[in-house]
Regions:
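Catalytic core of DAGKc-family lipid kinases
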Residues: 49, 56, 98-105, 110-220
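ATP/NTP phosphate-donor binding region
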Residues: 1-80, 90, 127-129
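Glycine-rich phosphate/pyrophosphate-binding beta-alpha loops
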Residues: 160, 164, 223-238
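Short acidic/glycine-rich loop or secondary-structure boundary segments that cap or lie
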Residues: 164-167, 216-218, 231-235, 259-262
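Glycine-rich beta-strand-to-loop/alpha-helix junction loops that act as flexible
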Residues: 28, 83-85, 109
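Short Gly/Thr/Asp-enriched flexible loops that form oxyanion-binding sites at enzyme active sites
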Residues: 88-99
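ATP/nucleoside-binding phosphotransfer catalytic cores, i.e., glycine-rich phosphate-binding loops
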Residues: 35, 210-212, 237-325
Length: 325
C-alpha cells in the first residue's frame, strides 16, 4: 500500500504490515557497531512476525548513499527503513533517486538522534520497529538542498557554517569518538571538542541574504545554522519554531558575542531559552545565502561537508513520506 496524495497527514489502515514489503538499509558500523547489535535484535522479531523484507548492508566500500542510489535507480515506489544514525539519514537522502517515490521509516542507532526529537519517533529498537510495522500515520517531511561553495548536498535536519561545523569536522577526526560511543557516552566528545574550538576558532564577518533580499552584515560570527528541524548538535534546541513540513528554513546566526557570554548562553540553548540574548538572531525564509569573509567549515546533518566561504540553502521542491506513531 502506497499513499502519495498528501493532506496534512495520511492515515494508515490495519492491513499496513500484512501488505507492505520492507527494505531495511542497515549501517552496521553506526555508533561504533551499535547498528549491527540493533539489527540482531530486529531481525528475529521480523522473522517471528513473518514480515516480508529484504536487507541491504552498507560497507566501507559502498556506503549508504551509493547503496540507496543503486536501489532506487528504478524509480519505483519503495518502503525504505533506515537503521543508523543522523549521518546515515543524511547519506540516504543524498542517495534517493526520487524522494516522492519513497516511504521512509527510521530505527535510530546513533548518539545524536536529532532527527527523532522533533518528530517524536521512538528510540528503543523494538518500539521503533513497531512504529515501522504499524505506523499511526505518514507525514510529509521537507528535505533541504544546500550548495557548499557550489558542491550540492541535501540534508534532513540542518546545514551550517562556522563553529558548529568545525566541531563536526574535529569530532570526525577524534580518536576518542569510537571509544566513547562504545560506552554510550558519545555526546561527551562533542562537548569536549566544542569547548576547545570555542577558544581556538576565529570569528569572521559575514553577510546573510534572505530570499534574495538585501545583505545583512554581521561581525564576529561564531556560526550560522540553517534548520529544517528545531534541534541539532545532539539536542541543542536552536530554532524552537522550526517545522519539518512548512517549506521554510529557520536560520540562526550567532555573532558579536563576548566569549564569557557564550558559556552562559550555550547551556540555555538545550531548552530554547537562548533566543532572547543579544547576538542571537533567528530568521525564517525560503532560501538563504551566507557569505563568510574567510573560509569556514561547513556541514550537513552533522557530517563534515566542505571548507569554504559561501553556503546556500533552501527547501527542496519534493517531500518524503515518513512513518510516525
Amino acid at each position: 500500500m502506497y499513499l502519495i496524495t498528501l493532506p496534512s497527514f495520511v492515515k494508515i489502515t490495519k492491513d499496513w504490515c500484512a501488505i507492505t514489503k520492507y527494505t531495511f538499509l542497515v549501517n552496521p558500523q553506526s555508533s561504533s557497531g551499535s547498528g549491527e547489535k540493533v539489527w540482531n535484535k530486529i531481525e528475529p522479531e521480523l522473522k517471528r512476525r513473518r514480515v516480508a523484507y529484504r536487507v541491504l548492508f552498507t560497507t566501507p566500500e559502498c556506503g549508504a548513499t551509493e547503496t540507496v542510489r543503486r536501489f532506487t535507480a528504478d524509480k519505483r515506489r519503495h518502503t525504505l527503513i533506515v537503521l543508523g544514525g543522523d549521518g546515515t539519514i543524511n547519506e540516504v537522502v543524498n542517495g534517493i533517486a526520487d524522494v516522492s517515490k519513497i516511504t521512509l521509516g527510521y530505527i535510530p542507532t546513533g548518539s545524536g538522534n536529532d532527527f527523532t526529537r522533533a518528530l517524536n519517533l521512538p528510540t528503543k529498537p523494538l518500539a521503533a520497529l513497531e512504529n515501522v510495522l504499524n505506523p499511526g500515520r505518514l507525514v510529509p517531511l521537507d528535505i533541504g538542498c544546500a550548495k557548499l561553495d557550489s558542491v550540492p548536498r541535501k540534508f534532513a535536519v540542518s546545514s551550517g557554517i562556522g563553529f558548529d561545523a568545525s566541531v563536526c569536522h574535529f569530532v570526525e577526526k577524534s580518536s576518542f569518538k569510537a571509544f566513547l560511543n562504545r560506552i554510550h557516552l558519545g555526546n561527551l566528545i562533542y562537548t569536549g571538542v566544542a569547548l576547545k574550538r570555542l577558544f581556538l576558532d576565529s570569528r569572521v564577518d559575514a553577510e546573510v541574504i534572505l530570499d534574495d533580499g538585501e545583505p545583512r552584515h554581521f561581525s564576529n560570527v561564531y556560526f550560522a545554522a540553517c534548520m529544517n528541524h528545531p534541534y541539532e548538535g545532539g539536542g541543542f534546541f536552536f530554532c524552537p519554531e522550526a517545522k519539518t513540513d512548512d517549506g521554510m528554513l529557520d536560520v540562526l546566526v550567532a555573532a558579536d558575542i563576548p566569549l564569557p557570554k557564550v558559556f552562559l548562553i550555550l547551556p540555555t540553548a538545550f531548552f530554547g531559552k537562548h533566543t532572547g540574548f543579544s547576538g542571537v538572531h533567528i530568521f525564517r525564509c525560503r532560501k538563504v545565502e551566507i557569505r563568510a569573509k574567510e573560509p569556514l567549515a561547513m556541514h550537513t546533518d552533522g557530517e563534515p561537508a566542505a571548507v569554504g566561504t559561501v553556503l546556500k540553502t533552501e527547501i527542496c521542491k519534493e517531500q518524503i513520506l515518513l512513518m510516525v506513531p
